[in-house]
Swiss-Prot record:
Pfam families from the UniProt entry: BEN
Single biological process term from Gene Ontology: negative regulation of DNA-templated transcription
Gene name of the record: bend5
Domain notes: The BEN domain mediates DNA-binding.
Entries under PANTHER family matching the protein: BEN DOMAIN-CONTAINING PROTEIN 5 (PTHR14628:SF1)
Listed name of the protein: BEN domain-containing protein 5
Domain of life: Eukaryota
Keywords from the UniProt entry: Coiled coil, DNA-binding, Repressor, Transcription, Transcription regulation
Organism of this sequence: Xenopus laevis (African clawed frog)
Length: 393
């Protein structure tokens, strides 16, 4: 078993075998008094009986082996309690002078209650002189008394430094360097966090400005599209005129909620849809009962243009990209397209008031008309194949 002891003479700690402690036979690692002063041999020669006396020491910890003891020291699990100045339980041969020592300690106190440690030797000499006058002490005991009285003062002078004796100096310096390095890293991290926070604030301001600009651009686009629709309606209110539009300059605008359509007028069993567009009254009433936006738009396109016109036209007048040698077909009349959009808007507005839903459903009008044109062309091709087959037979 090993003991971690602190010698009171020089305040140095050692890990020594427990056998070097005189008259000490522990039964476990907890069988010791940390406040008691023991007699410990510092070297093997002293223990073997060579010249040298045991020294006063304080046992701080016990362990089964030296490795466990060193681990406890490195982990700072050892505390140094204050030593008791009562040596009545210690195996020292001069414990008979304990009462005299305590009485002299009480005389070494200042008026404010603190011990006068600066001049212990003068007081010791006075005590020794008084003891010499008494015949029960011989000269051989003077040296021992001097040792007894000087040791408590020596230990009191080191009382404030007990805690520093646990951690080795190398470990302390290493921990201090690590602590200073971590402080520098923490300052650097705090600086980076502050810089990042300022950047985030600036980005948030820019994002807010960008959001307001995007909203303004959207509003301007909506107003521009409505203005285009109004102009198309005014252009189509006169005689029916097919407008010649260059395919490269024409771009069908994205649909938005349209203004309220004109009041439909019934004359000679026909219904006026606006912009000079008239349809059959009976077919118009049948169209109102149609379910689904796709079917409604396709049937309305057939009522306005007819299948013969639709099969030879396109919505935008731009050639398809699916065929390399595709020839662009003439676009449909813009004012008639606006009539289709107005009718579709009037139909959707009766079902919902959500502008987003209205805009989404209106954006599919051109798609439905394109599908109808493709269906007509497909039917015509199938009819031509059947006729060619019959002619061959």
């Amino acid at each position: 078993m090993f003991a971690f002891v602190r010698f009171l003479e020089d305040n140095v700690c050692y890990a020594l075998p427990a056998t070097r402690v005189r008259e000490f036979h522990p039964h476990s690692t907890e069988d010791f008094d940390s406040r008691r002063v023991y007699a410990v041999y510092r070297s093997l020669e002293e223990e073997a009986g060579f010249p040298g006396a045991p020294q006063q020491a304080q046992i701080l910890a016990l362990a089964e082996n030296k490795t466990d003891l060193e681990n406890r020291v490195m982990q700072k699990k050892i505390k140094i309690p204050k030593i008791s100045l009562n040596y009545s339980e210690q195996p020292w041969e001069y414990k008979d002078y304990e009462d005299e020592e305590d009485s002299e300690f009480r005389h070494f106190k200042r008026a404010d209650g603190r011990k006068q440690v600066e001049s212990p030797h003068k007081s010791i000499e006075a005590v020794v002189a008084r003891l010499e006058k008494q015949s029960f002490i011989g000269p051989s005991h003077n040296t021992r008394c001097d040792e007894v009285f000087s040791e408590p003062f020596h230990s009191v002078g080191h009382m404030d430094r007990l805690e520093a004796a646990v951690v080795p100096r190398v470990l302390y310096e290493e921990l201090l360097r690590s602590y200073q390095q971590q402080q520098q890293e923490m300052k650097h991290i705090q600086h980076e966090l502050e810089r990042t926070r300022k950047q985030l604030v600036q980005q948030a301001k820019k994002l807010k400005d960008y959001g307001s600009l995007v909203t303004e651009v959207k509003e301007l686009r909506v107003l521009n599209r409505r203005l285009q629709d109004v102009l198309l309606l005014r252009l189509g209110s006169g005689p029916t005129i097919e407008l010649q539009i260059d395919k490269s300059d024409y771009c069908d605008p994205e649909p938005e909620p349209e203004p309220e359509p004109e009041i439909q007028k019934i004359s000679n069993e026909e219904v006026h849809l606006g912009s000079g567009v008239w349809v059959n009254e009976e077919k118009w009433h049948q169209l109102q009962a149609t379910q689904g936006d796709s079917k409604y738009t396709k049937n309305l396109a057939v009522m306005i243009w007819g299948t013969d016109v639709l099969k030879n036209r396109s919505v935008t007048g731009v050639a398809t990209k699916k065929k390399k040698d595709a020839v662009p077909k003439p676009p449909l009349s813009p004012h008639k397209l606006s009539v289709v959009r107005e009718c579709m808007y009037d139909r959707i507005a009766r079902e919902t008031m959500d502008e987003n839903e209205i805009a989404q459903r209106l954006s599919k009008v051109n798609k439905y008309i394109c599908e109808k044109i493709m269906d007509i062309n497909k039917s015509c091709k199938n009819e031509e194949r059947r006729e060619a087959k019959y002619n061959v037979q």
